[in-house]
Amino acid sequence: MRLDKFLKVSRLIKRRTLAKEVCEQGRITVNGNVAKAGTVVKEGDELVIRFGQKLVTVEITNVKETVRKEEASTLYEVKKEEPISKSE
């Protein structure tokens, strides 16, 4: 599944267009590599997403085309959440 679609389906980012913009800005890495919106992701991949003043590391646990809102968080597991220091 494309990265931008996964981010939207999992509700890590609300809209696919916003997910695409975040990817274009280089704020997401997949397994340590800066990712584009079209990067294919699979179970076991590690995403690091820069949200404003924090870095969130998640592992993809499941990939589905559609899920209900209540089940969206079952697609990933948050591994780490840390603030970004001012020097970065």
From Swiss-Prot:
Q: Which SUPFAM superfamilies match?
A: Alpha-L RNA-binding motif
Q: Which GO terms describe its biological process?
A: translation
Q: Which cysteines are joined by disulfide bonds?
A: none
Could you list this entry's UniProt keywords, alphabetically sorted: Protein biosynthesis, RNA-binding, rRNA-binding, tRNA-binding
The record's listing under Pfam families reads: S4 (PF01479)
Instruction: Show the Gene3D superfamilies listed in the entry.
Output: RNA-binding S4 domain (3.10.290.10)
Q: Which GO terms describe its molecular function?
A: rRNA binding; tRNA binding
Is Heme set as a keyword in this record?
no
S4 RNA-binding domain location: 1-67
PROSITE patterns according to UniProt: S4
What is the role of the protein in this entry? Key component of the ribosome quality control system (RQC), a ribosome-associated complex that mediates the extraction of incompletely synthesized nascent chains from stalled ribosomes and their subsequent degradation. RqcH recruits Ala-charged tRNA, and with RqcP directs the elongation of stalled nascent chains on 50S ribosomal subunits, leading to non-templated C-terminal alanine extensions (Ala tail). The Ala tail promotes nascent chain degradation. RqcP is associated with the translocation-like movement of the peptidyl-tRNA from the A-site into the P-site.
Q: How does it assemble?
A: Associates with stalled 50S ribosomal subunits. Binds to RqcH, 23S rRNA and the P-site tRNA. Does not require RqcH for association with 50S subunits.
Question: Which family, according to UniProt?
Answer: Belongs to the RqcP family.
Q: What is this protein called?
A: RQC P-site tRNA stabilizing factor
Q: Which organism is it from?
A: Halalkalibacterium halodurans (strain ATCC BAA-125 / DSM 18197 / FERM 7344 / JCM 9153 / C-125)
